[in-house]
Amino acid sequence: MADSERSEAFGTPDDTPLSSNDAAELEQLRREAAVLREQLESAVGPQGTARSARDVHQLEARIDSLAARNSKLMETLKEARQQLLALREEVDRLGQPPSGYGVLLSTHDDDTVDVFTSGRKMRLTCSPNIEISLLRKGQTVRLNEALTVVEAGTFESVGEISTLREVLADGHRALVVGHADEERIVWLAEPLVAEDLPDGFPDALNDDTKPRKLRPGDSLLVDTKAGYAFERIPKAEVEDLVLEEVPDVSYEDIGGLTRQIEQIRDAVELPFLHKELYREYALRPPKGVLLYGPPGCGKTLIAKAVANSLAKKMAEVRGDDSREAKSYFLNIKGPELLNKFVGETERHIRLIFQRAREKASEGTPVIVFFDEMDSIFRTRGTGVSSDVETTVVPQLLSEIDGVEGLENVIVIGASNREDMIDPAILRPGRLDVKIKIERPDAEAAQDIYSKYLTETLPVHADDLAEFEGERPACIKAMIEKVVDRMYAEIDDNRFLEVTYANGDKEVMYFKDFNSGAMIQNVVDRAKKNAIKSVLETGQPGLRIQHLLDSIVDEFAENEDLPNTTNPDDWARISGKKGERIVYIRTLVTGKSSSASRAIDTESNLGQYL
């Protein structure tokens, strides 16, 4: 072993502190190694007495063993030193005084800042590690024991909720109202006033969407002591009731309602697209449209298509790209608009129309759609357990009248009990246009089926073979056969026998209660049967028999639906108007005559009869 290697093996690093015992042990090892070196040199040197080769090997092995022990001891000492340093850092950390937090109020050119902390407003210095230019008003900062700003945090995420009354002229302050109707002026934190944030700002404060403009009625997260509003809190109850969307439904997706679509286009699109002509003829555009008719016949679908078509038409008029056409469809969930607290329903209605006005002020068409309109705007005075309609209806009337001088907004209502809606809403000047969405006849049913049974669907090889592989001819024949079966006045299609108050009787078939939703359900059943057939037989494709079987199943599911307790009320909802019905008897095969029930007294007819 060379001298350098020996010194490295038995040496100690300069920066390693050793105890007295460790030093003594190392010194003993050095002396012993020196003696061994002398013995080795005397054994192999030119003047020494020759010794046996075995003694030389023993001495070398002894030296290697001592070197290994010394190296292991050095590693142990290094690990112990590292542990001592880590413990010392932990002790120093635990012994540090507590840090305080405050809200940044403002910054100054001399690298000082105003901070609100512990109920006081103080001017403090900043650590050199803090970039003053990145600090933002309302931000939380950490202070050391000397009240020096040492760290910048995010904005406060908890606090009191206050309602915004208005934003003041400077744009940085706002008037808010607390829970006890206490008004106060607060500063708006940076996220509420800045449209973009600089690079290097904390990621928690960056958002892909720029903050929208604050509007009266917004809920704000406020620290009343510091006098700052940090965040706009979405109103869950209003967000749930109003769905802002750009509908992707077009008129081409709707079948069997050509005449009704033409009516609503005349009522809605013409005033928007040809405003100059309307002004020239001094013609006031309609404020609203009522779509009424039986359930499942496409009222909501038409309303969505109106918003989609209107956006594209206005984009064409302006010369914009129709693919980037923008419109808003505010879909109001009628029954959920009702609230047990006095004044809440009216407040929701005000907020809905306020949002519509804001969207329309940007030049974008806005459709405010009230589904199930009869549930919230029924005739005043008809309530049994509640008189909420006495205030809700006037609120809607005032909002509709307020739309008079506002462009790009139209109200569309949908109901299957238009007779229950308050007459003041339906009068000319409010919901001017009334369009009845009727049940589809055989011709309309073929049009609806063609929307669902397209040439892209897989068709069974046997059915295609009947038409020499002509897929369009096969699909057309399928539609004709299924419509003939659905609209045939045969015994299997007999549904009800109704008795009117004057004693007349009438037999009703399933076709009298058909709807677009039922047709879609028939097609969906057939497609499911085709999938099951593929799994069972391995032969893919839709067959006419799948459609015919689906009609039978659909009719069977509907045989128990007629309400025999209040037959006239049920008939009105189903779209049957005219003479009052007092008796219903089901005619479906296998049904017992006990399923029918006569209504003889006026007291049992319900509140609408």
UniProtKB/Swiss-Prot annotation:
Molecular function per GO: ATP binding; ATP hydrolysis activity
Region span, Docks into pockets in the proteasome alpha-ring: 608-609
Disordered, as annotated region: 1-25
Gene Ontology terms: cellular component: proteasome complex
Pathway: Protein degradation; proteasomal Pup-dependent pathway
Listed GO biological process terms: modification-dependent protein catabolic process; proteasomal protein catabolic process
SMART domains tied to this protein: AAA (SM00382)
Pfam families: AAA, Prot_ATP_ID_OB_C, Prot_ATP_ID_OB_N
Entry-linked InterPro entries: AAA+_ATPase (IPR003593), AAA_ATPase_domain (IPR050168), ATPase_AAA_core (IPR003959), ATPase_AAA_CS (IPR003960), NA-bd_OB-fold (IPR012340), P-loop_NTPase (IPR027417), Prot_ATP_ID_OB_2nd (IPR032501), Prot_ATP_ID_OB_N (IPR041626)
Binding site for ATP: 296-301
Keywords tagged on the record: ATP-binding, Chaperone, Coiled coil, Nucleotide-binding, Proteasome
Superkingdom of origin organism: Bacteria
Keyword Metal-binding listed: no
Coiled-coil annotated residue ranges, if any: 19-96
Subunit description: Homohexamer. Assembles into a hexameric ring structure that caps the 20S proteasome core. Strongly interacts with the prokaryotic ubiquitin-like protein Pup through a hydrophobic interface; the interacting region of ARC lies in its N-terminal coiled-coil domain. There is one Pup binding site per ARC hexamer ring. Upon ATP-binding, the C-terminus of ARC interacts with the alpha-rings of the proteasome core, possibly by binding to the intersubunit pockets.
Function of the molecule: ATPase which is responsible for recognizing, binding, unfolding and translocation of pupylated proteins into the bacterial 20S proteasome core particle. May be essential for opening the gate of the 20S proteasome via an interaction with its C-terminus, thereby allowing substrate entry and access to the site of proteolysis. Thus, the C-termini of the proteasomal ATPase may function like a 'key in a lock' to induce gate opening and therefore regulate proteolysis.
Domain comment quoted from the record: Consists of three main regions, an N-terminal coiled-coil domain that binds to protein Pup and functions as a docking station, an interdomain involved in ARC hexamerization, and a C-terminal ATPase domain of the AAA type.
Protein family membership: Belongs to the AAA ATPase family.
Name of the protein this chain belongs to: Proteasome-associated ATPase
Origin species: Mycobacterium marinum (strain ATCC BAA-535 / M)
Gene: mpa
